[in-house]
C-alpha cells in the first residue's frame, strides 16, 4: 500500500517504522523545524529525522488548508494516510483524499482522554488502565470510530515518560495489526465511540506544574509522576523553589500547615499537604541537575536540624 505518514514527536517514530516495514511510505508530513536548545537553533522533529534516515520525502507545511497543500497530497496517490501526534488539524478535504481515508493512533481508550495530552492526564487522574486506539478519522477532535484497540495497566509508580514509551510501542503494534488486515483485504470493523465517558486531555503547560501544598498528597504525587519528564512539577520546599522528579504520597495524620517540613532523611523529605504528606525522593535545584533527597540534604544541612 502507498501510505502518507503524518507525525511529529518521539511518540510517532515507532509507528512510522511499523508503517514502513511492509508498506511504501510515499511521504512524511511533520511540523516545521522549531527553535530548540540553548542556542535556539532550528531543530527537526524526531519524525523528520527518521524519515530522512529512511530516504522518505518530507513535507512541512504550515497548514493543510491551502489549495497547494491539497494538490500535493492528491498527487501522492495514497491508499491511506496514517496520523500520529501530527499537530495540525486535518480538514475534511484532506480526510477524503486517500482511498481508505485517514487513520489515527491515539494514546488512550477513547472516548476517555480525547485531546493533546492523554498519557499525562490519565496518570494525573489516577486511572489504573489506559491503552491505544486505532481510529478512522472524522472531522472533530478524536471523535471517529475505533478500528482496533489494546489496553494496558498503569503502574503504581509509573511516570509520564515511562508510560509514553510503552504506549508508543503498543501504538505501533496496533497500527501494524490494522495495516496487516487491510493488506489482506480485510477492513477492520469501525465501532462508534460511546456517547458516555467522554473526557478531554487538555494540553500541558508549565503553569500547571506548580504544586500547591494545600492539595491532597495523593493528587500531588500523581502530578509529579504525570509531569515527568515534562513539564516537571515544581514547588517551594523549605523556602527554595525546586523541581520534583520523584515523590510518593504518605497517609500521614498531622496538624502542620501545608508546606511544612515534617521529616528529612535519606529516604526522602516529607512535606505536609492538605491531606497526608508528600515524600520527595528526587529533586532539582535551580541551575542544577536532578539529585536524590540524600544528596540534597547534604547541601541543606539546616533541614536536618529542623526535622
Swiss-Prot record:
GO terms for cellular component: cytosol. This is Methionyl-tRNA formyltransferase. (6S)-5,6,7,8-tetrahydrofolate binds at residues 108-111. Belongs to the Fmt family. The keyword Manganese does not apply. Its EC number is 2.1.2.9. Attaches a formyl group to the free amino group of methionyl-tRNA(fMet). The formyl group appears to play a dual role in the initiator identity of N-formylmethionyl-tRNA by promoting its recognition by IF2 and preventing the misappropriation of this tRNA by the elongation apparatus. GO terms for molecular function: methionyl-tRNA formyltransferase activity. Keywords: Protein biosynthesis, Transferase. Pfam families: Formyl_trans_C, Formyl_trans_N. It catalyses: L-methionyl-tRNA(fMet) + (6R)-10-formyltetrahydrofolate = N-formyl-L-methionyl-tRNA(fMet) + (6S)-5,6,7,8-tetrahydrofolate + H(+). SUPFAM superfamilies: FMT C-terminal domain-like, Formyltransferase. It is an enzyme of class 2 (transferase). The keyword Transmembrane does not apply.
